[in-house]
């Protein structure tokens, strides 16, 4: 069953990803302060692929509506360098 909410389509794009839970929480708080809607999901990293992620077991992915992407990138660009350096930004 598909629910239709007006012209809503599930076409969110990835804003950023990180393996650090604290960085993902700080990024989510920064987006909330600016009233930017987003979705934060976690993905479990398989045991044998953890070496590529420096031993992390969870990958946090923040997705956003494409129309709000520019505004969200400005929020991330204004974050502290300590947090920003731990994010992998997409090139949407």
Predicted regions and their residues:
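Acidic/polar low-complexity segments and flexible, solvent-exposed patches
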Residues: 1-92
